[in-house]
């Protein structure tokens, strides 16, 4: 995974259940906004993110990255969230900023249970 984008590494580690290892990729003073249906969770440090991640309901959840990109010190991902390797519960768009040491110092994600920008493509089973 040495050539993987940090955003790919972050989701892979998070989905493996290693929450502490995922949070270790974050700068201590990370700022984040996580927009979920009906609410936005904001935080201002690594501890806030750890509290959020540990507070999520226990479920076999996986982020399937359908698109990734980077532009300088900002990385992007678009994908679906799949539970129990069967049910797609929604789609997300995420962006993160990396500091000069490569740590994630800002993170923003939005999640929608219905809308996908790739609806037509997914309906035809196409994927890059």
What are these regions (language model features)?
Residues 1-18, 25:
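Short, aromatic-enriched amphipathic alpha-helices that serve as compact interaction elements
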Residues 2, 6, 48, 88:
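Soluble or luminal CAZymes and related metallo-dependent hydrolases
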Residues 9, 21, 76-78:
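Residues within well-formed alpha-helices
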Residues 19-21, 27-71:
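A solvent-exposed, acidic/Ser-Thr-rich amphipathic alpha-helical stretch
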Residues 50-128:
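A beta-strand edge to alpha-helix "cap/lid" segment located at domain peripheries
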């Amino acid at each position: 995974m040495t050539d993987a984008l940090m955003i790919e590494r972050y989701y892979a580690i998070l989905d493996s259940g290693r929450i502490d290892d995922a949070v270790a990729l974050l700068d201590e003073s990370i700022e984040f906004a996580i927009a979920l249906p009906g609410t936005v969770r904001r935080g201002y440090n690594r501890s806030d993110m750890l509290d959020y991640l540990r507070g999520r309901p226990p479920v076999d959840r996986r982020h399937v990255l359908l698109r990734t990109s980077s532009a300088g010190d900002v990385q992007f991902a678009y994908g679906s969230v799949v539970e129990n390797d069967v049910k797609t519960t929604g789609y997300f768009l995420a962006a993160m900023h990396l500091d000069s040491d490569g740590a994630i110092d800002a993170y923003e994600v939005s999640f929608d249970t219905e809308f996908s920008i790739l609806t037509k493509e997914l309906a035809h089973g196409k994927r890059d």
